């Protein structure tokens, strides 16, 4: 049956110090793959769809013929925008489970679409997922980031379509056991903002960012 599925692998080293690593990936099962033409260049990178194929060479959740971003620390916000999610060099951004199921090759997904996807995948819509006491006028950004040094902080830039209004808060989904909660600011976690320059956000850690 066509749909979105996940596969996970767990490896444990039984040496003196037990270490465990677990990886998970999502994949889409289709009745038939779309025909790729040598005359079509869907992502506009100068290479035909047929030549790029269905692979996901950089493992970011976007097939090669639809992916014109080489840098692993960049991810498209939406398919109709040039705005890019950005993390530090050396890290990797990957579409989250809901963004991957949304099949738009970008990290932005609406709350309504999340509910629809959960229904289509026959998952239970728990209170932890449906943050119904809040509205999300700027949408939900679903992604994972890897490659950062453990216990160290790193910068993540999320370009927004409009300025942040007074009273708006940044919330983060912490998994099914915790659910949604406001982003906790402390010595290691801080929110910054800056005006876009030529519709582009300053680089991560730029001095152009101010607190809040």
Question: What residue spans do the PLM features occupy?
Answer:
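An exposed acidic His-Trp-rich patch
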Residues: 168-212
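Surface-exposed, short loops/turns at beta-strand junctions within beta-sandwich domains
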Residues: 2-3
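Extracellular fibronectin type III
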Residues: 19-23
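Short, solvent-exposed loop/turn segments at the edges of extracellular beta-sandwich modules
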Residues: 11-18
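Extracellular calcium-associated, cysteine-rich motifs in secreted modular proteins
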Residues: 26-89
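Predominantly extracellular/luminal regions of secreted and cell-surface proteins
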Residues: 78-120
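Hydrophobic/tyrosine-rich beta-strand signature of extracellular beta-sandwich/beta-rich modules
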Residues: 7-9
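Proteolytic processing hotspots in large secreted/extracellular or virion-associated proteins
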Residues: 121-177
């Amino acid at each position: 049956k066509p749909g979105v599925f996940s596969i996970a692998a767990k490896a444990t080293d039984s040496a003196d110090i037990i270490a465990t690593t677990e990886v998970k990936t999502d994949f889409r099962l289709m009745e038939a793959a779309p025909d790729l033409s040598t005359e079509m260049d869907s992502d506009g990178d100068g290479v035909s769809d047929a030549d790029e194929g269905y692979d996901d060479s950089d493992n970011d959740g976007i097939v090669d013929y639809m992916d014109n971003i080489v840098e692993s620390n960049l991810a498209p916000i939406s398919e109709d925008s040039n705005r890019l999610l950005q993390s530090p060099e050396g890290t990797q951004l990957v579409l989250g489970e809901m963004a991957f199921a949304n099949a738009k090759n970008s990290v932005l997904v609406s709350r309504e679409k999340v509910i629809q996807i959960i229904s289509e995948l026959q998952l239970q819509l728990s209170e932890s997922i449906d943050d119904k006491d809040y509205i999300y006028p700027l949408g939900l950004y679903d992604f994972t980031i890897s490659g950062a040094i453990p216990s160290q902080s790193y910068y993540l830039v999320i370009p927004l379509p409009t300025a942040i209004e007074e009273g708006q808060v940044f919330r983060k989904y912490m998994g099914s056991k915790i659910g949604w909660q406001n982003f906790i600011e402390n010595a290691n976690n801080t929110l910054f903002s800056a005006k876009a320059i030529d519709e582009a956000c300053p680089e991560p850690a730029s001095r152009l960012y101010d607190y809040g």
